[in-house]
Curated annotation (Swiss-Prot):
SMART domains given in the database record: CARP (SM00673)
Highest taxon of the lineage: Eukaryota
Gene: cap1
Name this polypeptide is given: Adenylyl cyclase-associated protein
GO molecular function terms noted in the UniProt entry: actin binding; adenylate cyclase binding
Function: The N-terminal domain binds to adenylyl cyclase, thereby enabling adenylyl cyclase to be activated by upstream regulatory signals, such as Ras. The C-terminal domain is required for normal cellular morphology and growth control.
Keywords of the record: Phosphoprotein
Keyword Lyase set for record: no
PTM sites of type Phosphoserine: S92
Listed Polar residues bias regions: 288-300
Amino acid composition bias (Basic and acidic residues), ranges on this chain: 352-361
Span list, region Disordered: 34-55, 288-333, 348-395
CC terms in the record's Gene Ontology section: cell septum; cytoplasm; division septum; growing cell tip
Amino acid sequence: MSDMINIRETGYNFTTILKRLEAATSRLEDLVESGHKPLPNMHRPSRDSNSQTHNISFNIGTPTAPTVSTGSPAVASLHDQVAAAISPRNRSLTSTSAVEAVPASISAYDEFCSKYLSKYMELSKKIGGLIAEQSEHVEKAFNLLRQVLSVALKAQKPDMDSPELLEFLKPIQSELLTITNIRDEHRTAPEFNQLSTVMSGISILGWVTVEPTPLSFMSEMKDSSQFYANRVMKEFKGKDDLQIEWVRSYLTLLTELITYVKTHFKTGLTWSTKQDAVPLKTALANLSASKTQAPSSGDSANGGLPPPPPPPPPSNDFWKDSNEPAPADNKGDMGAVFAEINKGEGITSGLRKVDKSEMTHKNPNLRKTGPTPGPKPKIKSSAPSKPAETAPVKPPRIELENTKWFVENQVDNHSIVLDSVELNHSVQIFGCSNCTIIIKGKLNTVSMSNCKRTSVVVDTLVAAFDIAKCSNFGCQVMNHVPMIVIDQCDGGSIYLSKSSLSSEVVTSKSTSLNINVPNEEGDYAERAVPEQIKHKVNEKGELVSEIVRHE
C-alpha cells in the first residue's frame, strides 16, 4: 500500500517537474533562436503516458538544477542540456541576445508621460471639443520628444545649425505649429483662454535646442502659460471644477517636465559619445527605414496602393479667350430700375424721334430686310485700377539703445523675454499685437502704447507702468510696482501679487478694466474699475464728484 502511494506521489511530482522543465526548455530555445545560436541536440521531453515513473529529488536551499535519479536517457539528456543552458557562460550568451535594456532617462520619461500626460489627456477628452482636438497634437508632440531623446542617445552631436538637426526636429515643430493654428483660428471661441494656455506653454518642448541652461527657458515658457491659466481659473471658479482640474493638470505637466529635465538633462540634450555612435543623418535614415518597413509589407499583402483618381473634367471656360470681357449681368440692378420708374415724365427725355423712313408700318420694304443693326457699342479700355494704398508694415524690433529697450511691431510672438534689464533701464512697448512679453528683474519704468491683445509680465519697477491707447491688454505684477497709469484703454486685466496690493492704479478715459486681487486660496478675485462718475455743485458753488457703484 505504501509502495502504491509512493508511486502515485512520485508520478505526480514527475509530471509537475516535467511540465516545468518543458516550459524552461521552450523559453531557452526561444532566447537562443532570437540570437541565431540554437542549442545542439535539444529535444522536448516525451508526453507519452506509458513512460516509466522516475524518482526526481531537489536539494532545497541550493541554487543548483534538479537532479534526476533515473537511468532514462531522455530525461538524463534533458537534465544535462538544461543544466548546460543555465550555466554562467550560456546565461551571458542569452543576455546578449535579449532585447537591449531601456536607458534610465527614457524609462523615467515613460513614467512621467504615463503619470502626468495621461492625466491631462483624460481630462481633455472629458471636456471635448477644441480642447480635446488640441490635446491630441500635444500628445503627439510629447511622443515625438521621446523619439528625439532615444535617437540622441545613439547618434553623434550635430552642429546646432545643421540641416540634419532641423530635419530631426521638424516633426515636433509641425505639431507645435498645429497647436498654435488651432488657437489662432478660434479667437472668438469660448475656449480661447484654454487654447492659449496650452499654446503658450507647449513651446517648452524646445528645450532640446537650448544649451547649456535649458531650465531657465522652460521656466519662462511655463510663466507664459500661467498667465492664461489664471484667467481660466478665475473664469470657472465655483462654476466648473472640471475646467479647474484640467488647467492644473496642464501646469503640473509642465512643472514635472522641468523636474525631469533637471534630473536627466540639466545642461541640455545628451548625445552619444561612444565609439559606435553614428552620425545623425545615418540615425535618421535608419529611423525612416524602420518606419516604412512595416507599412510596405502590409501594402504588398493587400495588392498595393489604389490607383490615383482621374483628373478633373475640363472647365467649360477652357476655350474662352481670356481677353474677352465678361458678359454683363442680365438681372440688372433692381434699385436702378425703380429709380428710372420714379422719374415720371422725365423717363422719356432720353428718347429720340423716329424718322418716317425708319417706320416699318409706313415702309413695307423694311419688314423684309429686318431691323437695321445698330452700331456696336465701343468697349472702353479701362486702365488697370490702382490698388488701394495700405499702411506700410513696419519691421519688428527688439533692441537696447543706451538705457532704453524698444519692443515694437511684434505680431503673434509669445516668446519675448527680457532677462538682462538693469535698475536704470526702461522698456517701451509699441504697436504689438497678440504678444506675450516677460520682463525679469528690477528696472525703472515700462510704457506700453497702441497695442492689441498684448500681455506684459513684470517683476519689480521703481517708478510706474504706463499703459495708453491699448485694447484687451493684460498686466501681471510678480513682485511690486508703485503705480500703474492707464489712459484711453478699452478692455484690460491687471493681476496684482500679494506684495503689490499697495500699488496705486490711476485710470482716465478707459472702459472695461478689471483688477484681480489674490486671495488665500491662491486664486484671484476680480474687482471691476468704476466707469461712471456723478457730479453736482454744492452750496458753496464747488463741484463735487462721486463714483456711481452698481451693487
